[in-house]
Each structure stands twice: as C-alpha cells, then as structure tokens.
Design a protein with these regions (language model features):
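Transition-metal
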Residues: 1-68, 72, 207-214, 236
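A short secondary-structure junction signal
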Residues: 64-67, 102-106, 122-127, 131-136, ...
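A short glycine-rich, His/Asp/Glu-containing loop-to-beta-strand
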Residues: 85-93
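Short, conserved beta-strand element in jelly-roll/cupin
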Residues: 93-97, 106, 110-120, 125, ...
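Double-stranded beta-helix
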Residues: 114-169, 174-175
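A short hydrophobic beta-strand segment most commonly corresponding to one strand
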Residues: 134-136, 182-198
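Conserved double-stranded beta-helix
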Residues: 159-160, 194, 200-236
C-alpha cells in the first residue's frame, strides 16, 4: 500500500530517513534538506531517480515486529556460520525505476527481501580484490564505502534478478551494485554484525591510525583480534 507507506514516512523521525537523488551535477547525491511533506517524494518516484532509505526499522512501530520475527527465524541458520548475532537492525529501501546504486560495500551481513518491483543485484566475488586495503582504511576513517567502477568488473559480477518474494544473502563487505527494473522497488534488508566483524573494524581502524604516521600495516588477516586489542588499549 504505497499511500500508507507514504503516510508512515511523512510521520517518522527525519533522523531515520536518508534520501539520495541523481542530478545533473552528481550521481546519488544526498538530499541536504527534506521537504516539509515527504509524501510527494514517495508518490513522485516514477519521475525521478530517487532512493529513500529508512534506517533502524527496529525503532519504527510499523516495522519492528516484522524485523523481530525475521531475526528469530534466521538466527538458528546464520549463527552456525557467522557466530552470535550482534547489533541486528534493518533498513527499507524505496527506489525509482531504472535507478543504479553505485558500487559499494557494507560492513554487515545482510539478507535482502524483495517486496515490490524488480531489481538486479550484482555481487562481485572476492577474487576481484575489493574492497582493497586502502578502501577498508578509508571506510574506517571516514565512512566512505563507495568503490571505483572499472569496466572489466562487469564480466566478474554475479547477477541476481530479484522479484517480489525473493531473498538474497549478501556476505560481509561483498562489493555490489543494484539496478532497479521498470517499476518502483521496495526492498527490506535485515543486517547484523558478528564479534569477528567488530574486531575487523578495530583492526582496520588501527591501520588507518598508524597510517597517519606513515606506518603501513598489512591487512588484518585471520587474527584481527591482535590489532583490535591494541587499538582498545590505546583508547583507554
């Protein structure tokens, strides 16, 4: 129900909403100011290249019960692979037809559920070498998770065509790009962290910190807890 969704967004905490648009000046530009009534942005998706993200759905009364049910259902499966679920949350993505989300990576494990419309979700394999060491260090320094696209990456991607009712697991930090089909799209992402991924965060943050002093460390590798412990000691 698009009208109900528009009403829900219009009444929500603006801090939990992020809006981006393609403009002649910049692709995927963050909208610096939200209009007084957000309903028009939802109803006008067809005539724009717009991306609306609702974050922390566990804080939205209309979505929190669904998020809790999904996490309860997937926990027995995912915990055998990623360890205990840490910092779970969820996002709703509402996108204009034809919108292309730039190549990027996310620091979470993710299961994406396609609700309305269609999209092609293309994941790059680890063999592509992304995100690189510099990409990781930049992300943990500034939060910038965008990656440079190179034409040769197109042949390496794994494309998944998603229709309503489909779901897709997106691995931790897997590079991906998304192309929306001919109709507006709604997707739900349920994400979580693991203790290992949080240690990766601290290990990469230590790399970035020492890099400011021209000390270059290799990637954290299989034992990130060593650098994570060092960073936590420095923070005390």
């Amino acid at each position: 129900d698009w009208a109900r969704l528009a009403d829900t967004i219009a009444a929500a905490d603006r801090a939990l909403i992020e809006i981006r648009e393609d403009t002649p000046q910049q692709r995927f530009r963050v909208l610096p100011e939200h209009p007084a009534d957000l309903r028009a942005l939802v109803h006008g998706l067809d005539g724009a290249k717009r991306w609306i993200m609702l974050r922390e759905l566990d804080r939205w009364p209309d979505f929190a019960p669904l998020v809790a049910d999904i996490l309860q259902a997937v926990a027995p499966v995912v915990e055998t692979r990623t360890g205990a679920i840490v910092k779970p949350t969820a996002f709703l993505f509402i996108s204009s037809p034809g919108l292309v989300t730039p190549l990027h990576f996310d620091p979470e494990y993710n299961i994406l559920f396609q609700i309305s419309g269609r999209k092609r979700f293309t994941i790059l394999p680890p063999s592509c070498g992304l995100p690189s060491r510099s990409d990781n260090e930049r992300f943990h320094r500034s939060g910038d998770n965008l990656l440079d696209w190179r034409p040769e990456l197109a042949a390496q991607g794994w494309p998944f065509d998603l229709a309503p009712g489909d779901a897709l697991h997106v691995p931790f930090k897997a590079p991906h790009t998304v192309t929306v089909g001919a109709e507006p799209s709604i997707s739900l992402s349920v994400t979580w962290r693991s203790h290992s991924s949080l240690m990766q965060d601290d290990a990469w943050a230590l790399n970035g910190l020492l890099g400011r002093y021209r000390v270059r460390l290799p990637a954290p590798g299989a034992r990130p807890w060593l650098r994570a412990a060092a960073l936590r000691a420095l923070r005390r």
